[in-house]
């Protein structure tokens, strides 16, 4: 076991026991990609030769390529428990429990966080759908449920509201950074951030540095529509687009159960693409990525860039 402690904005975050993890080869850039056709259907059967990778406009040689069903999956589920979600939480519990039961395999892990006025870890890494379901049972409006082992992930914000950006940052930096395989953050929220100390770009940067993909489930109670200012839809879209994820919208014709089924299908239809950058300078700078499919009718969904972290 190892202890992980991070300091954010002058606030010392609580150290927690973490599972020992393997380190990734820092010279290899790994990209998760999904491919869709013009009808938005997933394309799961492409080969390495069907892809082109550009870094800052320069072609790169793909060294590693695999279907994502072969790699372990680490999921962080973040559930909005602010007042605007009060009438949706029971539905979220049931749908998320079913999702974990269907998507997790023996080598996969997941953790569960809630966020409202603060962020809280309800269930640490586990491969047990039963433990995750128990954690879902502890969801409570406005800040989650207290006293759940191993305790709260300290929030950055002390203001009242919905600390969406802070929660994503904490999930990426405290939980996912350093893990191997596929790393996914699934956020269930109406997208309206209120009270975070960090901004949207900082949340995106944290996810990119952790090689994590953000999938946003836009779930809004119609009774609260417009009550908290502008829609959070643009924020959800930006965070998902920049990290290679997708926004799923729950509405009368598209249930949360259906959304989780589509998300599961996408996770099982991904490609992992790896290359060694021709630019060997590790200056901490941002490198733009452009992943293309040979078939012009296909659209590749992948992160827009990465940070060349200094050794």
Residue ranges and their predicted role:
Residues 1-4, 19:
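Compositionally biased, low-complexity segments enriched in small residues
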Residues 3-14:
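Sec-dependent N-terminal signal peptides
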Residues 15-311:
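Scaffold/interface architecture of coatomer-like assemblies
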């Amino acid at each position: 076991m190892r202890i992980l402690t991070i300091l954010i904005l002058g606030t010392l975050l609580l150290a927690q026991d973490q599972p020992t993890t393997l380190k990734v080869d820092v010279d290899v850039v790994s990209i998760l990609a999904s491919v869709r056709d013009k009808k938005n259907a997933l394309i799961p059967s492409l080969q390495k030769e069907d892809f082109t990778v550009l870094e800052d406009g320069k072609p790169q040689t793909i060294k590693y390529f695999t279907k994502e069903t072969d790699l372990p999956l680490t999921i962080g589920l973040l559930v909005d428990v602010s007042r605007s979600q009060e009438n949706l939480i029971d539905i979220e519990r049931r749908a998320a429990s079913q999702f974990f039961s269907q998507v997790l395999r023996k080598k996969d892990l997941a953790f569960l966080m809630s966020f409202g006025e603060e962020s809280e870890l309800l269930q640490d890494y586990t491969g047990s759908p039963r433990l995750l379901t128990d954690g879902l049972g502890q969801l409570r409006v406005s800040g989650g449920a207290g006293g759940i082992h191993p305790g709260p992930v300290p929030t950055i914000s002390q203001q009242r509201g919905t600390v969406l950006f802070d929660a994503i940052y904490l999930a990426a930096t405290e939980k996912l950074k350093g893990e191997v395989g596929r790393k996914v953050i699934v956020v269930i929220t109406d997208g309206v951030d209120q009270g975070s100390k960090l901004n949207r770009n900082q949340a995106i940067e944290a996810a990119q540095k952790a090689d994590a993909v953000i999938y946003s489930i836009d779930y809004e109670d119609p009774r609260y529509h417009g009550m908290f200012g502008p829609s959070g839809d643009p924020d959800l879209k930006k965070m998902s687009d920049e990290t290679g994820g997708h926004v799923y919208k729950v509405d009368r014709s598209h249930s949360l159960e259906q959304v989780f089924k589509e998300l599961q299908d996408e996770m099982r239809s991904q490609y992992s693409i790896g290359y060694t950058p021709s630019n060997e300078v590790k200056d901490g700078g941002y490198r733009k990525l452009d992943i293309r499919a040979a078939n012009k009718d296909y659209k590749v969904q992948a992160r827009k860039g990465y940070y060349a972290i200094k050794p």
